[in-house]
Amino acid sequence: MGFITKAIPLALAAASVINGAEILETRAGVQTLADKYIVVMNDGMSDKDFDSHRSWVNRTHRRRLIRRGAKAMGGMKYTYNFPTGLKGYSGHFDEQMIKEISKRADVKYIERDARVQINAIEQQDNVPSWGLARVGSREPGGTTYYYDSTAGEGTTAYIIDTGTDIQHEEFDGGRATWGENFADDMDMDCNGHGTHVSGTVGGRTFGVAKKSNIVAVKVLDCNGSGSNSGVIMGMQWATEDAQSKGADKAVVNMSLGGAFSQTSNDAAKAIAEGGVFLAVAAGNDNVDAAEASPASEPSICTVAASTEQDGKADFSNFGQVVDVYAPGDGITSAKPGGGSQVLSGTSMASPHVAGLAAYLIGLGKGGGPQLCDTIKQMAIDVIQNPGSSTTSKLINNGSGM
């Protein structure tokens, strides 16, 4: 079985307001995590005021724990303070504590934390891939990948996923490194999805940008499962690390998503506002991607999946929020422990775009979120039946072949 990444985060179905703070409700079927929440602060909050708020939360939570009958909860876990944009935190709180937090005038909204996971579709081992050849050619059916020898050299791709087998031969014994882990205590890809995605971005055989550096940011465990709060923490870590090394030389790939989540979209927007290019899978439910997050965030590059025959993959989401199509059906790339496997999904399409972004940065095309416009301008108008109100543009690296 191949893999499609699917997140089941929080939906903005409706909102209740208590003294100014929205408590966002969830749609039926969303797998929320019991008594776990994400709290987002008002825009423009200073670090000093944020520290003061969190101190109040910790004090209030401790007082509640020692009261008779107060339910034992873990309290605050992750703190979010993106270099630009989103400030907030996640944690384990009872209903009364959340009501107290919601009364604060400095709180913008609260969402329930939710489970994130990947779903399997199909897998066939050891067959040739077509995606690379399609990216480097203006005509379908080719078997050769044409590209400039710069191949993304000097760029860094952050893969927010299940981790990456950094020892895989695809990464030449050093181009892939471990970043951070917000999923479990095992710094390895015990699922396989993240290694496949990394190989499409920067593998020496399967990669679009064959000389780019890969950084593994693990937010999903061996079962392909994690939390929305952990994913956002991975997004923050990647943004901060990219900015410390040069945001204009960095790209981020997120082959995950799901139902609309304001927090997820706000975090994606913060990456873009931080000057970092972000490619995101459109989703695999054959619906309008405006219903998905972070795919529906307009400041990022949202990618739908195409077939070898230049059609829309039957599972791919569509709609006005889609920026481009990229190969996503039956894509060969690396698997943990060596060798390759074939997976399908918009999860496989998105890293073609992240790799193309790194490739173009290496060519001196400039970096940052505006690179998505360059990619759209270079794309070719070939996708058949792309879906209602959807672009028919397929990515191309401009090699002229």
UniProtKB/Swiss-Prot annotation:
Pfam families: Inhibitor_I9, Peptidase_S8. This is Subtilisin-like protease 7. GO terms for cellular component: extracellular region. Residues 21-119 form a propeptide. The lineage of its organism: Eukaryota, Fungi, Dikarya, Ascomycota, Pezizomycotina. It is found in: Secreted. Gene3D superfamilies: Peptidase S8 propeptide/proteinase inhibitor I9, Peptidase S8/S53 domain. Keywords: Glycoprotein, Hydrolase, Protease, Secreted, Serine protease, Signal, Virulence, Zymogen. The keyword Cell wall biogenesis/degradation does not apply. The keyword Ribosomal protein does not apply. Residues 36-118 form the Inhibitor I9 domain. Residues 1-20 form the signal peptide. Residues 129-401 form the Peptidase S8 domain. GO terms for molecular function: serine-type endopeptidase activity. Its EC number is 3.4.21.-. The active site is at D161, H193, S347. One of its GO terms (biological process) is proteolysis. Secreted subtilisin-like serine protease with keratinolytic activity that contributes to pathogenicity. It comes from the Eukaryota. Glycans are attached at N58, N223, N253, N397. It is an enzyme of class 3 (hydrolase). Belongs to the peptidase S8 family.
